[in-house]
Amino acid sequence: MKIFLTAINAKYIHSNLAVYNLRAYAKDYQEQIAIGEYTINNRVDYILEQIYKAKPDVLCFSCYIWNMDYVEELITEYHKLCPEVPIWVGGPEVSYEVETFLAEHPQVTGVMIGEGERTFEQLCGYYVNQAGSLDEIRGIAFRNQDSGKTVFTLPQEPMNMSDIPFCYDHIENFENRIIYYESSRGCPFNCSYCLSSIDKKLRFRDIELVKKELAFFIEKKVPQVKFVDRTFNCRHDHAMEIWRFVKEHDNGITNFHFEISADLLNEEELALIHDMRPGLIQLEIGVQSTNETTIREIHRTMKLELLKDIVRKIQSGENIHEHLDLIAGLPYEDYATFAKSFDEIYALKPNQLQLGFLKVLKGSYMYEHAAEYEIVYHAKTPYEVMKTKWLSFDDVLKIKQVEEMLEVYYNSGQFEITMKVMEPLFDSAFAMFQELGVFYEEKGYFGMSHSRIRRAEILLEFMREQKSEDAVLQMLEESLTFDLYYRENCKSRPLWAPSPAEFKEQTRYYCKNGVKSHVEPFHYRFPEKSKKALNEIPTRLKQPVYMLFDYENRDPLDHQAHVTEVAAVSMAEETKSAGKAKLC
């Protein structure tokens, strides 16, 4: 007997915690369970071939918005090849409107609804032991063979989180991939767009068990552990125990990612966070909107000014990589109010500002009230908003331009200095990205692959069309040069940069003995990292200053080179120092 669990991930570096939990919990049937993990970048035919070669006796699929189209095609095609093999599905994408799903997919034997660990174990017993009946298994829906009607069994009782065995014993199978870890399940909040709000029974894994498992990850030096807890810090003592543990057992390599509610953080937690190694943890903070009417309508609990204050306090330690999230397309959010939300959160200058679009998920409050809000969304996954009562499709398209420009020029971290010096030249940050997006659209640059240096050239083209003064363009040329060398020692020198022959003495003096470094002259002192925003552009200096980019000592948060201003060196000094070692 072979029961085959199929996971189709969004990226290779992802792993599917759900299928590993299912196998771990069904411990009496380990030998009969196999897992096949693929990605949406694999051809459907390739996945189909692999499943067929595995020759499963029972085929199961883990279903999410990013893979549902693939799953539906695989179900259809595999059933043609092996109609005798039962096909079961589970996951958030099939746990709602189950009867409709089964009616539309006659190839599917049944659906595992909600939490699947105990249900899957019982299903394994049913097939392996060839005993009992499906209607004795809680948490499933299946088609009655005689009447064709959908049969729903009793729902499963909520899982005790500590009963789920650790699923990463064979950690070598997850090399170069993100480890997903769950220390709690459920959410205390009631956000209308989110499925986590439906599970009101908040449960936590035993803290000593959590510590033991985190110690395993730390010992194995895995690169990243991403907690999937919906609001990690909703219980203060639980969060403190885990943060204290990872701090005390830090191996200098492993990074931990947490999704938190910033306005729940207290001074004790902030003090602990500030004392951590730079890069030890990442924090993802959902804001979604700053429009008070929108926040109330989506049932979100958030004290905005407190959140901003906490975000600034986190940043003051200069040791935490911080993501802030916004959602376009929420009720009562029009183009103008979204632009305001964007500018308010962009002003905080997080390491990344994730701009997403509303997904109308089956089972959510938003799904039930979509008609009331006049939300039009895609019929296919991921059910992304197209327009609402407040936001036209034209507006959505404009915001999508902003999103792409934000990803390329801000979230990439590759144009940090240039974004800072450009912002004062526009009415707002949102306007800057919007106008840049319009420029890309007019020039046909969207949809094309551009090198990093080409992205810089396009920025200069854009600013020339803005009829910027020569002084501004000179400054931008230098800021772009700074940004290009900030990340790496460029193989191709930008065309606008001065010839290296003009400062060869500095290069010979400061970049010796094979040390990975670069020296460059600038006529501007550009803002340091701690300077989040500028009120005016920098003043041009009469004489250049020389900046040394050290690629062997990078910032642990954004991996930019360490940069220091160094003294100008004359040819006589350079000659005098010949043969002597110089630290870079």
Q: For each predicted feature, which ranges?
A:
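Radical SAM [4Fe-4S] cluster-binding motif and immediate context
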Residues: S162-S316
